[in-house]
């Protein structure tokens, strides 16, 4: 079997883990080759040219060779384009990478998904408010994976109406329901206004309600695909709980009975 070589391919690094004594095993996503597994030999050595280059969230130019599933990375250069995310944005970047790692298969080219990944990474790294971008990315990912329902027409063949109410469930079409309809306990589903579905389809969230409904819907499908959950989301939730406890501890009553921050 001939040895396949790829040179100077822009990639996003999704994850890396130690390999033997001094190497790294890297999962990367490229526009032309999809997700690829790369072995970066001696990358953990202090004198390695790869040290400090193999970082997530920004573009890296990678060159590799090999005919097996695990390729050998022989060159990498930092392309950059934006700074590394900080604070909560860091967890959002990790969340996006974890979705890509768990929901894509190796060597399945998805150019549109690569473009969506580039857009959301730039937003997370550069914008103060990027929640809209996360919801757009999640929905594009679900669409490109073929698991998102059609939001142009409902299961009865009718056009999604802005004033209607619809039941959204995994693995089935969207169906119209009455405004008082409630999802049965322990059943997976979201009841959403038609306008929210239109906004999600178009990627333009006109109201806070539409953005909240988008979160419920994308989370519904992601939980269906990944029932074991996401580590990045669990860690962020733990931080949020810690922050809430700290806020409650630092807030003490004043002499007039109102609350005041003690710090």
Swiss-Prot record:
Entry keyword set: DNA damage, DNA recombination, DNA repair
GO biological process, alphabetically ordered: DNA recombination; double-strand break repair
UniProt name for this protein: DNA repair protein RecO
Region span, Disordered: 243-263
Gene3D superfamilies, sorted: Nucleic acid-binding proteins, Recombination protein O, C-terminal domain
UniProt biased composition (Polar residues): 252-263
Record-level GO cellular component terms: bacterial nucleoid
Organism domain of life: Bacteria
Matches recorded under InterPro entries: ARFGAP/RecO (IPR037278), DNA_rep/recomb_RecO_N (IPR022572), NA-bd_OB-fold (IPR012340), RecO (IPR003717), RecO_C (IPR042242)
Species of provenance: Neisseria meningitidis serogroup A / serotype 4A (strain DSM 15465 / Z2491)
Function: Involved in DNA repair and RecF pathway recombination. Involved in pilin antigenic variation.
SUPFAM superfamilies (UniProt xref): ArfGap/RecO-like zinc finger, Nucleic acid-binding proteins
Family to which this protein belongs: Belongs to the RecO family.
């Amino acid at each position: 079997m001939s040895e396949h070589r790829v040179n100077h391919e822009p990639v996003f690094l999704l994850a890396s883990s130690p390999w033997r004594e001094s190497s790294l095993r890297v999962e990367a996503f490229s526009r032309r080759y999809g997700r690829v597994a790369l072995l970066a030999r001696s990358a953990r050595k202090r004198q390695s040219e790869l040290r400090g280059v193999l970082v997530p969230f920004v573009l890296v130019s990678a060159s590799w060779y090999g005919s097996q599933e695990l390729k050998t990375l022989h060159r990498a250069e930092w392309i950059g384009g934006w700074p590394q995310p900080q604070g909560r944005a860091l967890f959002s970047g990790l969340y996006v990478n974890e979705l890509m790692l768990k929901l894509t298969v190796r060597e399945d080219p998805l150019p549109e998904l690569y473009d969506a990944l580039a857009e959301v990474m730039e937003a997370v790294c550069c914008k103060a408010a990027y929640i809209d971008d996360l919801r757009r990315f999640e929905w594009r990912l679900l669409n490109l994976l073929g698991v998102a329902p059609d939001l142009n027409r409902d299961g009865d063949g009718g056009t999604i109406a802005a004033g209607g109410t619809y039941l959204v469930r995994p693995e089935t079409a969207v169906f119209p329901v009455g405004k008082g309809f409630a999802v049965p306990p322990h059943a997976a589903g979201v009841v959403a206004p038609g306008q929210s579905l239109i906004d999600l389809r178009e990627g333009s969230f006109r109201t806070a309600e539409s953005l909240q409904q988008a979160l419920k819907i994308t989370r519904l499908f992601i939980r269906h695909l990944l029932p074991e959950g996401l580590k990045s989301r669990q860690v962020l939730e733990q931080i949020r709980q810690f922050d809430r406890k700290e806020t409650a501890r630092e807030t003490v009553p004043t002499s007039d009975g109102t609350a005041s921050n003690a710090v």
